[in-house]
Amino acid sequence: MLSHRCVEILPRSGLQSGVSFFSDPLPSDATLIAEVPPSEQPQLFCHRRQTDQLMVLRGSFDLIVLQNRQLRRITLREDEATWVRIPAGVPHGAINRSCHSVVIVNAVLQHGPSDPRDYLPRPVPRSLLTQWEALIAGDD
């Protein structure tokens, strides 16, 4: 049985019309365009009452999620367009290894008012520090 707090990877769907692709919309309360700058010191964040639904529009980055007491790397790229749904309560962060900002869309689902603590970095659990450092370094 899957937990309601599992990260999901969803295929992009839509309509190809000539040279243009029109993506099907995801249900959301707000749609945000964000830039993820090159990362020197990536950090984890955790939204208490918000589900993020992310897709890369330009560039690529590694999304790191902390789930079931394990760190997981999910590489998101513009040429492999997929949605990643990160439920509320799942710590996550981005590692942009390029020298350019990555542009993403976030189809946000709100489950209540935002909490100022959602935007404060969370510590990486001590037992996962070695794995965290390897992920930052780009080691598998």
Predicted regions and their residues:
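Non-catalytic, conserved peripheral segments adjacent to functional cores
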Residues: 1-83, 99-140
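Asparagine-centered strand-capping/turn motif at beta-strand->loop junctions
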Residues: 94-97
